[in-house]
Amino acid sequence: MTKTFRNPQLTKNGELKHLLSIEGLSRDMITHILDTASQFVSLSDSDREVKKVPLLRGKSVFNLFFENSTRTRTTFEIAAKRLSADVLNLNINASSTSKGESLLDTINNLSAMSADMFVVRHASSGAPYLIAEHVAPHVHVINAGDGRHAHPTQGLLDMYTIRHFKKDFTNLTVAIVGDILHSRVARSDIHALTTLGVPEVRAIGPRTLLPSGLEQMGVRVFHNMEEGLKGVDVVIMLRLQNERMTGALLPSAQEYFKAYGLTPERLALAKPDAIVMHPGPMNRGVEIDSAVADGPQSVILNQVTFGIAVRMAVMGIVAGNND
């Protein structure tokens, strides 16, 4: 008897209960999240004195960040508060996990404090899945980044940014540049881009920083920066994740910038209206030149702004779906 695989993110009716990965989400589901985010962007842009909606009033959102974060944790906190939720940011270093308590023990204790949603960042790939398997039926889990595996809300806000500036995914060439081997953002972006019908996704980087299997995902691989940037509509730059590297994968940051840094001269090889993105934090002079990061084609700060609305959309959608 064949066992039917069930996506752990979805309810029995196929609705989004947790957001653990973009992989496995349909084009319609991703589009629904982006459309919902548009409504929250309009709320932020409006003249309303109070930019809040009561969607999560009376709900408790626990931000559990086992890795450092500035943008992601802050935007999740702002998003939850704009949805009128009560927000708790757990200080991991001061918590019982630093004294040897297991991850599931921590989750069980926090669940006993009437948590309705966990936003989780963890160094171990799969940690949010483990949590989602063990929480009470009414509790929702959102992956804010797990190891090298996935960063689904970053992927979604990247898609929102691309759609905002380029409108149609089906005629774009998108280049992802840098340390793709260690990047959970790259994996989420690739799954989202291919699901949304982008005809050409390129990966640009040195052989030591590109994972195997990219071609099987429909990605064109380039080791030469100039060749890879020719005629692209979108450039997504990634930082070097030195904290995840084992061994000497690069000669030096200076040599890396010479070969793969995005300079105005290299950006000129892309289409004249190409946009430049970066999930942050940026390392100026390593993967990107300040003239590009602060230039007219950069939409990096737009990504941060849109991230609040996208995370509001995700939280609002999952909170409404239970088995």
From Swiss-Prot:
It comes from the Bacteria. It catalyses: carbamoyl phosphate + L-aspartate = N-carbamoyl-L-aspartate + phosphate + H(+). Carbamoyl phosphate binds at R71, T72, R121, H151, Q154, G280, P281. GO terms for cellular component: cytosol. Keywords: Pyrimidine biosynthesis, Transferase. It is an enzyme of class 2 (transferase). Pathway: Pyrimidine metabolism; UMP biosynthesis via de novo pathway; (S)-dihydroorotate from bicarbonate: step 2/3. One of its GO terms (molecular function) is amino acid binding. Its EC number is 2.1.3.2. L-aspartate binds at K99, R184, R239. The keyword Transferase applies. Catalyzes the condensation of carbamoyl phosphate and aspartate to form carbamoyl aspartate and inorganic phosphate, the committed step in the de novo pyrimidine nucleotide biosynthesis pathway. NCBIfam families: asp_carb_tr (TIGR00670), PRK00856.1 (NF002032). Belongs to the aspartate/ornithine carbamoyltransferase superfamily. ATCase family. HAMAP family: Asp_carb_tr (MF_00001). This is Aspartate carbamoyltransferase catalytic subunit. It comes from Cupriavidus metallidurans (strain ATCC 43123 / DSM 2839 / NBRC 102507 / CH34).
